[in-house]
């Protein structure tokens, strides 16, 4: 007898089929199958076969032992394709739910592992991998041939093992037939190539078992063929049989033959010698199932019920018998009859099983007796040898399974598992849609994603031009280790290309790409949706549908083996189901698919007999009968599915024996008889479950009928937009599809809808995707109805809208001529149709609005209901928590009781310990172990305590660090607060100093300068030239000497007023590296012209040339320009070796624009893209700005008066963001050099009034944008400005003129626009009328010139008609203002001027400008001496009183008056200063009157007593004394580093005799205390005290003033030296304050009071003047005395004067 054992494993496990009668022993290579099903099968676990696939896979062995049949190649292809097609049709469904099924499969794999470990007691430690040894293989072969198996073996404790039972029939598994087969479907030609290549290779791949075709072998070889496949981990091989299906008529005849011969009909693998030659030979192998049996509540069971409905509808649609709804009752009755037959046959099941056991035992004893088995020479010819490519684990890190390969890489097999293979192919499919995965490899483009994992990483690409594969590093490590081919450069050939060459196979990549691009083609392997899976009752229902079409012979055979015929019919039903899972009508291979389906429907099982089985049967017939063998006749045992709707597995045993046999029964027979009662109990439970499933089937049928009534044909349901192959399951899907279709149509009506509509469309798509992912667990009936109605309305509206659009296009297409030729009725037809459609559209739109409102209300109501449900759930949760708390209290009470019991037990344990002494040595070992564990416990406790201590120490350290950190933080915060206060104090004291220096100290300095100038004019003593004076001196003073006649004679003397005002010229050679095209005007040759002009003045000693200025600090560049603009400018330069320049423009955001255009250089600037940049342009621009900053340092700190910067590129058109908003371009400019220099001067040198004069022919719009609104700067520009803005840049209309009402200028911008081709007269008139007065009113401290010489009449720009003499004149005008107000400080920066080729106008203009700038006339020098060198006789009124209201004139600039204490302090000090000044003036006035009287008296006495000789002696003495005195007089030192003749009075010691006349009571103590003033640009603070005696003890810088009090009451006018050895003598200048006090003239408006004005203050004390750059000292002539004994006058006040002239 033969039995078939069904072994369950993973989905891709290869099932070995062994026919004991045919001696085909197959040892499977199943790595994951650890089950030992020998003697451990149970009918109670038949539901474990739910996932078995009965269709033959391409991976299964084909054991077609048909001796007389000849199978053609076409039939063989059909054989190969028949099983896989059923499985593939439903793979698409599985792919859509891959995420859920992957989780289920992982859980099933874990459950399978547990089940296999429990089931296989003979496996050593549950080992999973490894090949069995030769001994184990032989043992397995012996057991598979001789060991009988009972269908159900129970364990001694009465439990049933987890794995499932045996089956003598290859029953088609209806549900598992619908299980997904991951093997890709191949076409006929591909399958033939695959079979031929595998047979020629002699082995199998990782996914393909050896495919053996019996047609290629002799008849005898087919009978004795043995396929031995090594099963690595299956220690006990199980035996199964295959069912070779044939036509149904032949199958029934064979069954009848077997019955007449009294053989066992359960052996279905008998050879049929009478088969026709055209029969299809199918070998349907049972694929092993995976996982534990599913329960009714699992997700897979829910899917099965849904799939059942689809399957029934599909079969009804393809069969006339099942499509009629009236036949449903007949079908149900047939199912009931089948259930009753199964229940009746249950009683006879055990007898057949027992007889089967007996037969198997007899066969085992026969072989034990030493009878050899027949073996053929082809036994191991097709032995399945493990492939050398079988590498594990999976390429995914951490995955241990590898039973698959990526379809995209075949024939190169990369080990992977199902989960990661699907995920990888999904990622590669997405990359294919994005374009990262190449569609056509012949293009030579390489992939951007890995061909194994699908990730976008760094790839190693194949060197073959026809291969686009690339692999990442992680995947290369595994694949290279497998194939021994590491990437070694650009010529590396990948593994896929190698295997294509060696195996001569086709690449799978092209087919896979076509599948993804054309998913509807059935010839391309693709994953279809999984079809419905059927439970037991549904399978029987479909079986009886097929039985109605069978012949009477089949019906008779089905009485013996109903399950067998049902299973054969299930194959046909599976074929029908394929039509529902995938519609082949849309495929180009429709006829071929229908042909295959028809073949499968007509196919049936054939029974074949082998020689061994025939011989064995004859031996059994000749043996005498046995009493124990007569148990029953033709008993059919059917086992139905268990709970959860398992698949029916029938174990059919037909026992027909006559007589008795002397052979004793096997020992297992008794065990089988004892288990019959338990089997009947389980069978009854299954029948009850079948009844319940029958009720479910009825409900599904009713639901199906209802859907057909509502929706018509099931196959014509609405197709989902997001998943076209998926049928909508609820109204939400229908609603989403209808709305999406409507939105998609409406969006096509307008190409540019409003932004609001676009946003709504985007939000709609986002919401639609979210709703599609929601799984509705609750039933919202009202919402569903409203949604369905709204969907229908939307559909109607969409149709009507489409019709309206079509009608509109139709009406629009009609031409007027056609309408005129048509009749009235003909013209009205389309109009009436359009009106009708519009009316219907409006009506539908109104209904949609109402329906939307009602749907919204229904949704709100449903939300409220859901919220109430949530509240109920929360309430239930609270109740559960309360119950759990009560339970926990109860449990805690029980725990306490248990602990009490434990304590009692411990006491008893102690008692038993006293008895341990009396025990044997074994007890001592126990005590030793206890002691050891206790020591370990103590050690661990000690370690834990130490760790706790360490943890506490760490916590303490952390707390200390936190405290320390907080304290430091608090300290830093206090310091920051203090620094902020200091900043506020510094700002306050600065503005206080600024104010008082302007209001008080400046007045005092001014009065002192006026008085000194008066005294200078009164001195008549001749002063010779100093050694270093210049030769060109002019006589401007006279000296009074005594003549021979004793009368005073006035002699003219020469005083050196020719001062050295030095000029510095700055340029850098990098400025020439700013490259522009040859046609451009702003060329590097302009710098060569300017430098050549500078070199002409190199011989002048007053001119210095500096050719290496540093780059400007980027901080000052950022103070002028936007940081983003500078960053874009630095990153937008062309490469270093580029032959082309780049056009550069920018908007306000700093974005660069490159345009292939250039400026029209012949005249107007029509084209706006005129600025070019090269690789070194930014370096040149930074050096240019650095030159201007170096000029500021030279003028402010290095003793130079003027500076000229020959730089490029120009900058006065560059605004804060590059191009200004009102200009068309940047006008050749990159960064604004003049603006950067002005900001630099303001920030570093402390200038508060800086004037920028731009006389370029183009308006300096960039400089105006940067400096506008800042009171520290004044910008003046004279340029060409047309009304129509034709001339570049079109900006700079007249602005900034004086206000006629207020007489003041408005703002800090003065623009003077000239008409084009204006001449010199108008140009110079504008300078005299507007520019010079504006500068006079502003009184700048520093002047910048944007020197643009493109206004010349010969310049290519043709803007103005000026000459080079005009630039000479305006430069002289600027110098005049500079000498008057800013000590001659001028910085000239080259801007425009492009006449360098023909006219050479630039050279002439620069020469004129430099000549006027460098060479000083006598009038200019005299103006400089008057302005800030000599003391002019300006008469001012009395010093004004201090007013606290004028303390802060501009709150926005100087801050708010928020510190009252500071204001009060300053107010008190200034009041004291006012009082001191008033008292000092009054006292000095009285003293002056007395001194004048005394001098008059002394002069009269001297004239009367003096003789002619004495007069000559006195004259010589006075001249000598005067000469000696002038060498030591108070001089004004300059900061010129080159002048060696400067006299620095900072370190001079003035020994002034303070003559305290005891008779003079008018001397004030204030006269003995000098007051220090420093008149630098950054003025110090005038500090006073509250002393009413006005004692100001201030010492000057390193000046030691020794006032010796000589008590000389008689001669107060003599000058006395305190140190007789000192050769120097000081000049005591009489202070005449009467002229100042009596002068009532108003102040001169040309010399207003300012911190930097020349005449500062009235207190004759220590004065430090800034900004006078002179190499020769100015000599102050003392006033001669009329007395012969008094060559010089003396100041009665004894106030010394130390005049220190230092620059900033």
Swiss-Prot record:
SUPFAM superfamilies: Arginase/deacetylase, FYVE/PHD zinc finger. One of its GO terms (biological process) is epigenetic regulation of gene expression. The lineage of its organism: Eukaryota, Amoebozoa, Evosea, Eumycetozoa, Dictyostelia. This is Type-2 histone deacetylase 2. Residues 70-81, 134-153, 315-325, 1649-1669 have a biased composition (Polar residues). Residues 1-303, 315-383, 540-634, 1485-1704 are annotated as: Disordered. InterPro entries: HDAC_PDAC, His_deacetylse, His_deacetylse_dom, His_deacetylse_dom_sf, Ureohydrolase_dom_sf, Znf_FYVE_PHD, Znf_RING/FYVE/PHD. Coiled coil: none annotated. GO terms for molecular function: histone deacetylase activity; histone deacetylase activity, hydrolytic mechanism; metal ion binding. Residues 186-195, 608-620 have a biased composition (Basic and acidic residues). Substrate binds at residues 1165, 1227. Belongs to the histone deacetylase family. HD type 2 subfamily. It comes from Dictyostelium discoideum (Social amoeba). The gene is hdaC. Responsible for the deacetylation of lysine residues on the N-terminal part of the core histones (H2A, H2B, H3 and H4). Histone deacetylation plays an important role in transcriptional regulation, cell cycle progression and developmental events. Histone deacetylases act via the formation of large multiprotein complexes. It is found in: Nucleus; Cytoplasm. It comes from the Eukaryota. A divalent metal cation binds at residues 1256, 1258, 1350. It catalyses: N(6)-acetyl-L-lysyl-[histone] + H2O = L-lysyl-[histone] + acetate. PANTHER family: HISTONE DEACETYLASE HDAC1-RELATED (PTHR10625), TYPE-2 HISTONE DEACETYLASE 2 (PTHR10625:SF40). It is an enzyme of class 3 (hydrolase).
């Amino acid at each position: 007898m033969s039995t078939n054992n069904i072994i369950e494993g993973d989905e891709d496990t290869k099932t070995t089929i062994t026919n004991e009668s045919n001696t085909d022993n197959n040892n499977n290579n199943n790595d994951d199958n650890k089950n030992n099903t020998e003697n451990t099968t149970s009918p109670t676990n038949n539901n474990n076969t739910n996932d078995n696939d009965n269709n033959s896979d391409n991976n299964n062995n084909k054991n077609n032992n048909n001796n007389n049949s000849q199978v053609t190649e076409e039939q063989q292809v059909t054989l190969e394709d028949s099983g896989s097609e059923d499985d593939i049709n439903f793979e698409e469904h599985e792919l859509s739910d891959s995420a859920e099924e992957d989780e289920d499969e992982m859980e099933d794999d874990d459950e399978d592992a547990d089940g296999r470990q429990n089931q296989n007691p003979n496996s050593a430690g549950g080992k999973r991998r490894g090949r069995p040894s030769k001994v184990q293989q032989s043992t397995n072969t012996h057991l598979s041939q001789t060991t009988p198996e009972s269908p159900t073996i129970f364990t001694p404790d009465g439990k049933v093992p987890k794995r499932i039972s045996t089956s003598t029939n290859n029953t088609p598994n209806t549900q598992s037939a619908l299980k997904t087969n991951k093997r890709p479907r191949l076409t006929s030609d591909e399958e033939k190539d695959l079979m031929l290549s595998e047979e020629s290779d002699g082995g199998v791949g990782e996914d393909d078992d050896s495919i053996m075709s019996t047609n290629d072998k002799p008849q005898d070889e087919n009978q004795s063929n043995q396929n031995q496949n090594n099963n690595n981990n299956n220690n006990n091989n199980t035996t199964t049989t295959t069912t070779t299906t044939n036509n149904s008529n032949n199958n029934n005849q064979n069954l009848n033959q077997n019955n007449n011969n009294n053989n066992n009909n359960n052996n279905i693998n008998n050879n049929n010698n009478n088969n026709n030659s055209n029969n299809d030979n199918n070998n349907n192998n049972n694929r092993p199932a995976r996982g534990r049996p599913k329960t009714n509540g699992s997700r897979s069971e829910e899917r099965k019920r849904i799939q059942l409905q689809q399957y029934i509808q599909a079969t009804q649609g393809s069969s006339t018998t099942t499509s009629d709804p009236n036949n449903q009752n007949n079908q149900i009755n047939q199912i009931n009859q089948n259930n009753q037959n199964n229940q009746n046959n249950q009683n006879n099941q055990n007898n057949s099983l027992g007889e089967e056991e007996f037969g198997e035992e007899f066969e085992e004893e026969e072989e034990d007796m030493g009878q050899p088995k027949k073996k053929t020479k082809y036994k191991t010819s097709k032995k399945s040898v493990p492939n050398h490519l079988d590498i594990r684990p999976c390429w995914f890190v951490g995955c241990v399974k590898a039973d698959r390969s990526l379809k995209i890489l075949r024939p190169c097999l990369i080990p992977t598992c199902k989960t990661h293979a699907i995920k990888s192919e999904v990622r590669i499919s997405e990359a294919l849609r994005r374009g990262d995965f190449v569609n056509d490899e012949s293009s030579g483009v390489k992939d951007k994603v890995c061909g194994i994992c699908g990730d976008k990483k760094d790839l190693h690409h194949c060197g073959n031009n026809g291969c686009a594969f690339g692999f990442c590093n992680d995947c290369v490590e595994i694949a290279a280790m497998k194939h021994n081919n590491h990437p070694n450069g650009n010529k590396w050939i990948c593994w896929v290309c190698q295997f294509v060459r060696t195996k001569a196979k086709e690449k799978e990549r092209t087919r896979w790409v076509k599948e993804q691009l054309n998913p509807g083609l059935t010839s391309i392997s693709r994953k279809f949706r999984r079809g419905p899976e059927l439970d037991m009752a549904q399978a029987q229902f479909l079986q009886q549908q097929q039985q109605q079409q069978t012949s009477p012979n089949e019906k008779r055979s089905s009485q013996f083996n109903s399950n067998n015929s049902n299973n054969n019919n299930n194959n046909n039903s599976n074929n029908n189901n394929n039509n529902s899972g995938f519609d082949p009508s849309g495929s180009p291979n429709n006829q071929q698919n229908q042909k295959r389906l028809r073949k499968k429907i007509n196919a049936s099982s054939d029974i074949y007999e082998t020689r061994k089985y025939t011989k064995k049967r004859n031996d059994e017939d000749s043996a005498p009968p046995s009493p124990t063998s007569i148990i029953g006749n033709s008993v059919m045992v059917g086992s139905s599915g268990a709970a959860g709707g398992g698949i029916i597995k029938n174990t059919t045993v037909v026992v027909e024996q006559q007589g008795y046999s002397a052979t004793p029964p096997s020992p297992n027979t008794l065990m089988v008889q004892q288990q019959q009662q338990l089997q009947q109990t389980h069978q009854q439970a299954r029948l009850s479950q079948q009844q319940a499933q029958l009720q479910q089937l009825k409900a599904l049928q009713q639901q199906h009928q209802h859907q057909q009534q509502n929706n018509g044909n099931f196959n014509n349901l609405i197709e989902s937009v997001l998943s076209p192959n998926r049928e909508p399951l609820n109204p939400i899907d229908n609603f989403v599809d209808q709305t999406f279709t409507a939105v998609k149509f409406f969006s096509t009506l307008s190409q540019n809808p409003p932004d609001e509509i676009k946003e709504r469309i985007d939000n709609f798509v986002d919401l639609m995707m979210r709703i599609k992912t929601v799984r509705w667990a609750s039933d919202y009936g009202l919402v569903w109805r409203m949604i369905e109605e709204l969907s229908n309305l939307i559909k109607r509206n969409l149709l009507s809208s489409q019709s309206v659009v079509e009608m509109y296009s139709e009406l629009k297409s009609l031409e007027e001529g056609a309408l005129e030729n048509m009749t009235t009725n003909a013209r009205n037809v389309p109009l009436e149709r359009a009106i009708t459609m519009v009316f219907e559209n409006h009506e539908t739109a109104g209904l949609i609005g109402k329906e939307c409102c009602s749907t919204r209300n229904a949704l709100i109501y449903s939300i409220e209901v859901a919220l109430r449900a949530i509240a109920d759930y929360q309430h239930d949760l609270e109740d559960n928590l309360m119950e759990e708390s009560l339970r926990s209290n109860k449990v805690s009470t029980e725990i306490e009781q248990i602990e009490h019991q434990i304590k009692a037990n411990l006491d008893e344990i102690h008692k038993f310990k006293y008895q341990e002494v009396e025990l044997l040595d074994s007890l001592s070992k126990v005590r030793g172990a206890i002691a050891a564990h206790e020591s370990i416990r103590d050690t661990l406790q000690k370690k834990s305590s130490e760790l706790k201590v360490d943890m506490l120490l760490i916590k303490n350290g952390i707390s200390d660090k936190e405290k320390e950190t907080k304290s430091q933080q608090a300290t830093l915060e206090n310091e920051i607060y203090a620094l902020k206060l200091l900043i506020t104090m510094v700002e306050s004291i600065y503005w206080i100093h600024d104010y008082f220096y302007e209001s008080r100290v400046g007045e005092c300095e001014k009065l002192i300068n006026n008085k000194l100038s008066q005294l200078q004019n009164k001195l008549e003593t001749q002063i010779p030239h100093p050694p270093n004076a210049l030769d060109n001196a002019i006589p401007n003073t006279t000296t009074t000497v005594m003549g021979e006649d004793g009368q005073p004679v006035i002699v003219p003397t020469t005083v050196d007023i020719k001062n050295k005002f030095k000029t510095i010229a700055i340029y850098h050679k990098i400025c020439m590296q700013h490259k522009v095209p040859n046609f451009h005007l702003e060329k590097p040759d302009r710098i060569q012209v300017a430098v050549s002009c500078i070199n002409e003045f190199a011989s002048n000693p007053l001119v210095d040339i500096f050719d290496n200025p540093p780059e400007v600090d980027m901080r000052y560049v950022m103070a002028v320009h936007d940081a983003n603009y500078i960053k874009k400018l630095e990153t937008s330069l062309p490469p270093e070796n580029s032959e082309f320049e780049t056009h550069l423009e920018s908007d306000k955001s700093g974005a660069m624009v490159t345009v292939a255009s250039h400026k029209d250089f012949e005249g107007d600037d029509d084209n706006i893209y005129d600025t070019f940049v090269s690789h070194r342009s930014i370096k040149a621009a930074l050096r240019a700005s650095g030159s201007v900053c170096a000029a500021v340092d030279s003028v402010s700190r290095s003793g130079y008066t003027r500076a000229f910067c020959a730089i490029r590129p120009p900058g006065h058109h560059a605004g804060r963001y590059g191009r200004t908003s009102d200009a068309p371009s940047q006008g050749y400019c990159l960064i604004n050099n003049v603006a950067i220099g002005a900001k630099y001067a303001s920030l570093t040198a402390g200038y508060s009034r800086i004037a920028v004069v731009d006389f370029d022919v183009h308006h300096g719009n960039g400089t105006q944008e940067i400096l506008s609104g800042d009171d520290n700067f004044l910008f003046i520009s004279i340029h060409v400005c047309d009304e129509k803005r034709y001339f570049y840049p079109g900006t700079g209309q007249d602005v900034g003129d004086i206000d006629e009402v207020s007489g003041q200028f408005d703002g800090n911008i003065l623009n003077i626009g000239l008409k084009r081709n204006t001449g010199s007269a108008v140009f110079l008139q504008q300078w005299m009328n507007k520019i010079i007065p504006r500068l006079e009113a502003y009184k700048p401290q520093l002047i910048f010139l944007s020197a643009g010489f493109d206004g010349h009449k010969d310049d290519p720009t043709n803007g103005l008609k000026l000459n080079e003499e005009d630039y000479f004149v305006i430069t002289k005008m600027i110098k005049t203002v500079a000498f008057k107000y800013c000590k001659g400080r001028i910085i000239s920066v080259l801007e425009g001027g492009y006449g360098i080729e023909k006219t050479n106008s630039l050279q002439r203009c620069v020469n004129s400008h430099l000549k006027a700038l460098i060479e000083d006339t006598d009038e200019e020098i005299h103006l400089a001496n008057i302005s800030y060198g000599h003391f002019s006789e300006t008469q001012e009124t009395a010093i004004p009183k201090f007013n606290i209201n004028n303390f802060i004139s501009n709150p926005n600039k100087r801050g708010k008056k928020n510190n009252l204490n500071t204001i009060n302090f300053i107010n008190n000090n200034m009041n004291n200063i006012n009082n001191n000044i008033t008292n000092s003036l009054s006292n000095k006035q009285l003293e002056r009157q007395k001194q004048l009287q005394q001098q008059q008296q002394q002069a009269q006495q001297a004239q009367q007593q003096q003789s002619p000789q004495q007069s000559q002696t006195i004259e010589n003495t006075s001249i000598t004394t005067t000469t000696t005195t002038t060498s030591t007089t108070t001089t004004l030192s300059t900061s010129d580093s080159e002048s060696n003749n400067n006299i620095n009075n900072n370190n001079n010691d003035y020994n002034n005799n303070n003559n305290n006349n005891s008779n003079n009571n008018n001397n004030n103590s204030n006269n003995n205390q000098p007051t220090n003033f420093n008149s630098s640009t950054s003025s110090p603070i005038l500090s006073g005290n509250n002393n009413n005696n006005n004692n100001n003890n201030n010492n000057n810088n390193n000046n030691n003033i020794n006032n010796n009090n000589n008590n000389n009451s008689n001669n107060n006018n003599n000058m006395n030296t305190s140190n007789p050895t000192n050769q120097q003598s000081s000049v005591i200048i009489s202070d005449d304050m009467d002229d100042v006090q009596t002068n009532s003239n108003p102040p001169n408006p040309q010399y207003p009071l300012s911190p930097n004005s020349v005449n500062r203050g009235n207190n004759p004390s220590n004065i430090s003047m800034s900004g006078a750059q002179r190499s020769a000292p100015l000599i102050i002539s003392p006033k001669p005395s009329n007395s012969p004994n008094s060559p010089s006058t003396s100041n009665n006040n004894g106030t010394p004067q130390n005049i220190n002239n230092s620059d900033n």
